[in-house]
Amino acid sequence: ALMSMTTIAFAEGEDAKATNTVAVYDMTVNYGKLADALGLSIDQLESVEDVHKTFCVEMMNAANASKDERKPMVDKAIEKNLKYMHYILNTNQYRKYLLLLNTTMNNRGLNK
């Protein structure tokens, strides 16, 4: 009985660790607040939503990848996201977006 309780406790610990890892990579945002912060037009907002949804999927894929694959996947997702955002946003909007994304990545410990 003691052995099975230890196994359950270990499994719960692993599940919590996996959940925390996935939460760190969850890049879901409130698009209304993002639109306000960046001063987006309706057309820009639609494009930003599409690009950001793809970014969210790529970050979740990275979260679920092996530790060795994770960093290259995150780097590629960020590079692709920034390339598309640079096309959609004007210079001031892009600068603000970079600041927001960089702050988010730093706060989650993803910029190492």
Annotate the PLM regions:
Residues F10-K112:
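Charge-rich (acidic/polar
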